[in-house]
Amino acid sequence: MGVDRSELLQGTLDMLILKIVALGPVHGYGISQRIQQVSREVLQVQQGSLYPALHRLEKRGWLAATWGQSDSGREAKFYRLSAKGRRQLQLEESQWNRLSEAVALILRTVS
């Protein structure tokens, strides 16, 4: 049986990107691969969603980017988390935890 690949909830992609980039400088393809690996193949980020999100996060000042060479020898844009991005990640993680706890409370409710 194949694995169902879930669509990301609206608004969670930015948080996931910030979290992955917090681990160290990484290029766009590396971000999508890391999300897929860490989620045990459940989450898959399409390029059509990833790159607009990266540009948006960079424009907001949450990510900084520099050009470098990828493992394959190709020129790639590497992203790192800015101080502003680190603060935003903390805020988003806090909000996510609060939301997750609220959903869990509802799911545990006995009918």
Regions found by a protein language model. Give the residues of each.
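Amphipathic alpha-helical dimerization/coiled-coil segments
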Residues: 86-111
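Short beta-strand "wing" residues that participate in macromolecule-binding interfaces
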Residues: 65
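N-terminal helix-turn-helix DNA-binding core of bacterial DNA-binding proteins
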Residues: 5-49
